[in-house]
């Protein structure tokens, strides 16, 4: 009888709001494991790539981003474990690159898989870094939309812009060195595309009896 009461009480406790083990949804649990595992993959990949960096500028970018991602990983892991606001706020990533993109295509050698470790250079390292950051940015975006815990949702969504910034920093490095070239359309096509949209005019028409206004505060 006592065992039955304990089981019944345990089942009742599972439905009580505010219980630490019950403020995460099922999808959220799986997605958070993907997010945190993905972050570890980025950090591990950066650590493995570091030994091959030849350009000090790229090495500085790698180290700066690794340090930032580590700090945000700790915040995310803490928030997920406690289900509450983390002890530290999410940070803003400040890149060092200027925002000047070089447009146009220049002749370059076709890309192909490396045949030995000696073929690894800064262009390959920066490409691997960019792919890792882009993939994690996508994961954060998709996962944040599945979060039921408001603290975890805010922590994830706050990091998306920072990953965009880190990806842009790596792109600018690649672009400056000719590793990532940016083609452009001719002037006429660009002008036509820029003028393909016009501002929206007016507001939605009211529904009969003003029912569309009910419940809006």
Curated annotation (Swiss-Prot):
Domain of life of the native organism? Bacteria
Question: Keyword Nucleotide-binding on this protein?
Answer: no
Q: Which GO terms describe its biological process?
A: sporulation resulting in formation of a cellular spore
Q: Which UniProt keywords apply?
A: Sporulation
Per UniProt, the ranges with Low complexity bias are 1-11
Q: Where in the cell is it found?
A: Spore coat
Tell me the segments the record calls region Disordered: 1-28
Q: Which PANTHER family match?
A: SPORE COAT PROTEIN F-LIKE PROTEIN YHCQ (PTHR39183:SF1)
Q: Give the UniProt family note.
A: Belongs to the CotF family.
Query: Mind telling me what this protein is named?
Result: Spore coat protein F-like protein YhcQ
Q: What is the lineage of its organism?
A: Bacteria, Bacillati, Bacillota, Bacilli, Bacillales
